[in-house]
Curated annotation (Swiss-Prot):
This is 2-succinyl-5-enolpyruvyl-6-hydroxy-3-cyclohexene-1-carboxylate synthase. The lineage of its organism: Bacteria, Pseudomonadati, Pseudomonadota, Gammaproteobacteria, Enterobacterales. It comes from the Bacteria. Its EC number is 2.2.1.9. It comes from Escherichia coli O1:K1 / APEC. GO terms for biological process: menaquinone biosynthetic process. Pathway: Quinol/quinone metabolism; 1,4-dihydroxy-2-naphthoate biosynthesis; 1,4-dihydroxy-2-naphthoate from chorismate: step 2/7; Quinol/quinone metabolism; menaquinone biosynthesis.
Amino acid sequence: MSVSAFNRRWAAVILEALTRHGVRHICIAPGSRSTPLTLAAAENSAFIHHTHFDERGLGHLALGLAKVSKQPVAVIVTSGTAVANLYPALIEAGLTGEKLILLTADRPPELIDCGANQAIRQPGMFASHPTHSISLPRPTQDIPARWLVSTIDHALGTLHAGGVHINCPFAEPLYGEMDDTGISWQQRLGDWWQDDKPWLREAPRRESEKQRDWFFWRQKRGVVVAGRMSAEEGKKVALWAQTLGWPLIGDVLSQTGQPLPCADLWLGNAKATSELQQAQIVVQLGSSLTGKRLLQWQASCEPEEYWIVDDIEGRLDPAHHRGRRLIANIADWLELHPAEKRQPWCVEIPRLAEQAMQAVIARRDAFGEAQLAHRISDYLPEQGQLFVGNSLVVRLIDALSQLPAGYPVYSNRGASGIDGLLSTAAGVQRASGKPTLAIVGDLSALYDLNALALLRQVSAPLVLIVVNNNGGQIFSLLPTPKSERERFYLMPQNVHFEHAAAMFELKYHRPQNWQELETTLVDAWRTPTTTVIEMVVNDTDGAQTLQQLLAQVSHL
């Protein structure tokens, strides 16, 4: 009997089972202990293979692939700290709903806690963050193949969102020629090998429930808050709110077209919040709200009813409103709760939104971070998509820009970390094949600099704008102690990215004005390669411009 041959047959069953649940993209890091899984993935023609040498980046690459494909994405890593590097992407997926399947190779039990190399306690290491955790036994023909495949089917068949951790111990030898070891064990699955369905099929979860009193509430004064959702859902939500005559407060990730732009500016005006107090019901569609003033209003509002509709399970209201938590696909929910044509009830807010946008436009000429955030809608590629980083840049775009309705926007706004942003953007581009504009800050780019290797392989133009304000300038918006702000919060690195781009053979530009930026973008959208654009800006102008606009709009 060949141990290495049976390891591969065991792994082949695992990988084939994944294909029955829609897995097409599989991300693989180098490693020896994961050899059975890697070779099984390589031999399965159903997979699109992605590789990366950095497991943390690999996890985020998978996250980006899952965001666009809406299907589970598998990740294969070797044992040891390689596994721990998947933690950030797993946490993000659990909060934003992407499906990740983490196949982590492991040492067999006799090599754990005895000083063996690269052997750590992997079962349960992700605590409560996976939706399911499976600790497989060492491959053995004493366990029927039907147990293995049905165990995986049960975990994936009930997976609605988040990650599944499948820990896979393999004993040595890991290498060797294939022989007939385990063929009869595999063949006991019969015609499952020729089928395309799971061995064990779980019943789908029940459909959305209709709120029987909706016909009563839709006649009231309502407010629609739009958080993270798909581009198609964003367009439907905008039309739904318009028909109802309810003001729509659209987050940067809502893709609703933000019909009342600059919400995070005008929500700082007492006239706006006073008018919103008249709302009898607030319907929040989607989670992960960005704007500080929006979150403050959301926490303080006291309507008669507060409904939150999102496909993700769990509590999504940090203000703990009394109301209804409705777990449903947003598009399906809208169909069950049709709008009734009514006249808009808000008067002040549309006026304030227009005046706020005019205040922003009046400052658009300076070559700066806030101005780029406002102009970003002018620079979007046709039939493309936008990936927005975290920290200051996403807040500036949320507050100062108005993105087109239905234009795809992606970000990591679950745990809102700055790790893995370039890797996630790479996954977003690969899964869609669309031209992609990604925008991040300098610290975010430094944090995930390894991911420039992933950006060498794109199928359409990708432009990465690095806004270099020399540190974490978001802390300039917070009451951090001035005496320690630079050393312990901003942490300026005084670096530029020309040599990083050159190391990975990526195009690089550092425009000095809007005309140079626009010329660079025109050229970049013509070729299916990555272009790194470093926009060096004054350290504090972005934060200061936002604060000045907030003060100005609050007194309108």
